[in-house]
Design a protein with these regions (language model features):
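Short, conserved catalytic/metal-binding motifs centered on acidic residues
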Residues: 142, 209, 257, 283, ...
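Acidic, metal-ligating active-site segments
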Residues: 184-188, 195-197, 202-243, 439, ...
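Generic preference for well-ordered alpha-helical elements
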Residues: 118-122, 135-139, 179, 201-204, ...
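E2/UBC-UEV (E2-variant) core
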Residues: 222-272, 310, 314-361, 621-691
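Electropositive nucleic-acid engagement tracts
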Residues: 115-201, 548-549
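Domain-level detector for long, ordered catalytic/regulatory cores in large eukaryotic signaling
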Residues: 148-151, 163, 266-426, 440, ...
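Terminal interaction-prone segments of large eukaryotic proteins
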Residues: 52, 56-58, 63-75, 79-87, ...
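Polybasic, low-complexity terminal segments and linkers that are predominantly intrinsically disordered
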Residues: 1-117, 613, 631
């Protein structure tokens, strides 16, 4: 007969074995209980439980307590025997069981949160895939791995992304074509509360331009893009066209668009019983696309000017040397009074649309990629009369390198060497023209060349700033005309090409549309680059783009939406004694701009004083957090130049001395951001127009 001690030892061995098997089962069944095994079976965790049990029991109480009779031990022996005979049938305890299980330690709120997270996971994963342009193949490889861990996800990426099965493209004007419609996007923007229209007016700008898709083939993309002024800078595709060349018929290409825009302008657009008047206000294109849409001579023709009746001259190339020719009118265009200017009849005439003033000249292509790049090329590769020495070029490149750390966060590209100027993007050329050029060129260019460049820089700055535009539009027009006249004298008559000539007409667009950024191609060029990235293989590029666009409708739109955020905590000060208990930060992302206490993003106008932010302080007011800045203003601001007008009037100053006094202001008082560039023993500070 088995002794009492043997029975106790046998019970202890079986319990220990069962515990080990339970641990193994939980690890092997993570798809049933997707919680960390360490969370429930960590040795330190178990040791803690055992200590709690031991503290409540006397030594050997569990086995020696007189309440446990021989009958109880007999029952336990029977149970042990049954368990040993049915080891393979052990199952994890269910939620309905009153026995111990890992989930018994999890609160209902935690389970609910986990359930909600699992429901949101497919949407979050889809948003991630779209944000980073993840291919179908990569996503199809990831999904099975995640499903192995019990995550409720579809097997195929197309199900996750809600990819349309059939895309009904058609052949139009020699290429594959798909039309979305403007009403589709208007409904989406209303649904997302993106539209702010106080007068029930919807104003549409469209853009037409081409971009090659591949480097090894002639396949190109010619979309019709749109923006709604009342919705800000949101770009939406109206139609997608892919072909081996540009559309072979402008009438076929624009047919669907013309039908819809006619209906919208005549009948308006109704949403939630509110009728909105729809107006097509501008068609924004570069020079070749404008000639294509308007059916006129291209930029290399004798009668290429869209704004004035001037016949070009041959000087090794077509030039337009005159600055006072008769201006064209919409009536002249419709009746084709200058037949040599036209090569056909534009379908846009049907809209009653002003064919002269409603086609802005797009300063991105005209000024930045056209005139500024031409000027730099003349300095580097032009005739000896204007060519810079290699030593001067090296000094300029060194200056660009030295000021890189002072360029604010809002500028995606920093200055780089002049040897790379042929690869400079439009944003880099704009940065050079408006901000860095007038400073780094000072003292290196001959005065006559520097003065000519400064005339262009000042004129464009005026046309980009609402306040300056209101006060100095006449001066900007005069400066641009004078620039064109002096440009021919300085660099040669043969340099008065299409882009240079059109500067005399640029101020008219600022009068019609406001600052030039409102009618430029910058946002459209950025969107074109995004469309190009949607093509993952050479077959059926149009269908690929359309599918990806429909998938992208699921994506959370975070464009130009900044969360208020303090970052990079420190204890370096400066800070007042009264605020010493508050948290200090280096950076703050606000709605208006990025604020920092480090070089490049710390020059601002606060309470009509210009200076620099020394520290950012977070204070708690109830449940919310507000911010303060330690701000030190300049002791004096001087003019950087006086011709063609005082730089003070343009918010450009030379500053060398600080007051040495730190003052406290609310973050909300920060009004205007300034860009700083080292110059002599101080800095040139200038108002930042692009945020």
């Amino acid at each position: 007969m088995t002794s009492e001690r043997s029975k106790r030892r046998k019970i202890a061995e079986v319990v220990s074995k069962l515990f080990q098997e339970s641990s193994t089962l939980n690890i092997q069944n993570q798809d049933v209980y997707p919680y960390s095994s360490n969370m429930f079976f960590d040795s330190s965790y178990l040791h803690g439980i055992r200590e709690q049990v031991d503290s409540n029991l006397e030594p050997n109480e569990f086995l020696t307590n007189s309440n446990y009779s021989n009958n109880s031990l007999a029952v336990m022996e029977t149970e042990i025997s049954e368990i040993e005979n049915n080891k393979n049938t052990i199952e994890l305890l269910t939620d309905d069981s009153n026995e111990w299980s890992p989930e018994s330690f999890i609160s209902d709120d935690y389970k609910s949160d986990k359930s909600n997270d699992s429901e949101k996971l497919p949407h979050k994963l889809a948003n991630w895939a779209l944000s980073f342009n993840i291919t179908y193949a990569a996503l199809n490889s990831l999904l099975p791995l995640l499903r192995e861990y019990g995550l409720s996800l579809p097997k195929d990426s197309r199900t996750l992304l809600h990819t349309p099965q059939n895309i009904d493209t058609k052949i139009v004007a020699g290429g594959e074509y798909y039309y979305f419609s403007m009403q589709y996007w208007l409904l989406i923007m209303f649904k997302n509360n993106s539209i702010e229209s106080n007068n029930n007016q919807l104003t549409i700008h469209i853009n037409i331009d081409g971009i090659p898709i591949f480097t090894s083939s002639s396949t190109s993309l010619w979309p019709i893009l749109g923006t709604l002024i009342e919705a800000g800078a949101i770009v939406f595709p109206i139609a997608i066209y892919c072909g081996d060349k540009k559309p072979n018929s402008i009438h076929e290409y624009l047919e669907d668009f013309l039908v819809e825009i006619k209906a919208l302008t005549e009948n308006g657009f109704t949403h939630e019983n509110v009728k909105y008047d729809v107006k097509l206000a501008a068609v924004i294109c570069d020079a070749p696309a404008r000639a294509f849409v308007k059916c006129i001579k291209g930029h290399n023709g004798y009668n290429c000017c869209e704004r004035c009746v001037q016949k070009g001259e041959w000087c090794g190339k077509i030039i337009l040397p005159h600055t006072s020719a008769t201006l064209r009118t919409d009536s002249d265009f419709r009746y084709q009074n200058s037949l040599e200017h036209h090569i056909g009849v534009s379908p846009l005439i049907e809209l009653g649309f002003d064919m002269i003033s409603k086609f802005p000249l797009d300063y991105m292509h005209l000024v930045c990629l056209g005139v500024v790049r031409r000027i730099i090329n003349l300095w580097l590769n032009g005739p000896r009369s204007c060519k810079l020495s290699q030593n001067t070029v090296n000094i300029l490149s060194d200056r660009f390198f030295q000021i890189r750390c002072y360029i604010p966060k809002e500028f995606s590209r920093k200055p780089r060497s002049l040897s790379d100027f042929r690869h400079w993007k439009a944003t880099e050329l704009r940065l050079f023209l408006i901000y860095t050029g007038p400073v780094v060129l000072k003292g290196l260019l001959e005065p006559k060349f520097y003065s000519n460049f400064l005339d262009l820089s000042v004129a464009i700055r005026i046309l980009l700033c609402p306040i300056l535009l209101k006060n100095y539009i006449g001066l900007a027009r005069q400066l641009l005309t004078y620039f064109v006249q002096s440009f021919g004298k300085l660099y040669g008559k043969d340099q008065l090409v299409y882009n240079v000539h059109f500067l005399i007409h640029l101020a008219d667009d600022a009068v019609n549309f406001g600052v030039l950024d409102k009618c430029s191609s910058f946002k459209y060029e950025n969107y074109l680059g995004q469309l190009k990235k949607l093509v993952h293989r050479p077959q059926q590029p149009c269908s690929q783009i359309v599918r990806r666009i429909f998938e992208g409708c699921l994506k959370e739109d975070r464009h130009h939406i900044h969360q208020l955020k303090f970052s990079i905590q420190h204890v370096d000060g400066p800070i007042t004694i009264a605020l010493r208990h508050c948290l200090q930060f280096k950076n703050y992302q606000g709605f208006k701009c990025f604020v920092s206490a480090t070089d490049g993003n710390n020059y601002f106008e606060v309470a009509k004083k210009i200076g620099l932010v020394r520290n950012i302080i977070q204070i708690k007011t109830g449940e919310s957090c507000d911010g303060l800045v330690m701000f030190e203003e300049f002791a004096a601001l001087e003019s950087f130049f006086t011709d063609p007008l005082s730089s003070n009037n343009l918010s450009i100053f030379y500053a060398s001395k600080m007051t040495g006094i730190n003052k406290i202001y609310p973050l909300s008082d920060i009004n205007i951001k300034y860009l700083q560039i080292p110059y002599k023993s101080g800095f040139i500070v200038m108002r930042q127009l692009h945020l």
